[in-house]
Amino acid sequence: MSNVFYISIFHIAGIKDGIGKKYVRGFYSERRMGMKLIFVRHGEGEHTKDSPSSLQVPHPPLTDEGRNQAKLIQCNVPLQEKDILIASPTIRTLQTATIWSAKVACQKIVHPYVSPRIFPYREGATTLPCDHIVDQGRIKKLFSNFSIEKSTNKQLWTEGINTISENSFQRIVEEFLLWCYELGAERICIVSHDGTITAYRQYLQKVVLTRADFLQETGIYEMDVSFKSLIGEI
């Protein structure tokens, strides 16, 4: 079951400290009033089958059950050609996105800003092998229908957002939302991870969430993001 949460982005990077206000005014006048973000957790991965030892396996793929779960998303949230599909740079998320979009020729992009994220954040935590990011060369070879977002922080293509500080993560969220707006699509569909999706929800909704709020495999969470109140803030 999906959830819809309406938010108004008045805290976007650069606005609150006076940078980029002119850009946003022009941006707002040229673009639509908002967009819908549809977060989907990937299907069941091999790393969950024999935990904790299976968490040490790098780049785990979907299980057969995970593939079947991904097929069901085609019915639960049918994609349209005008949608933009964004996937975390892991095998299981890219496989989920590939299956979901098998019947639709929509634009598909890989982006490290929705890669695995530890939740709740723990200072000093380390990234497990199952959450390592797939390198760009392998993505191009295995998932050639996906384009790679190249304008992002190069360090995040190797280390990801898994253990970055909360302040750094919040800046990532703000940058990601502006980037999504620049795409010009009404619906942005994002295949990501339980911790990442919950971290995005917590920051955008300004509420305290726990691991009990994690989506189930191929669970869906929708947000309608509006720019309406932004003009009054700048």
What do these predicted regions represent?
Residues 80-113, 140-151, 224-234:
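Conserved histidine-centered catalytic loops in small-molecule metabolism enzymes
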Residues 36, 40-109:
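Active-site-proximal alpha-helix that buttresses catalytic centers in soluble enzyme cores
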Residues 37, 83, 186-194:
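Generic beta-sheet signal
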Residues 205-231:
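Domain-level recognition of soluble alpha/beta enzyme cores
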Residues 79-81, 182-185:
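Glycine-rich phosphate-binding loop signature in dinucleotide/nucleotide-binding domains
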Residues 47, 56-61, 104-171:
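Phosphate-handling substructures
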Residues 21-34:
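Short, Lys/Arg-enriched N-terminal segments with co-localized hydrophobic residues
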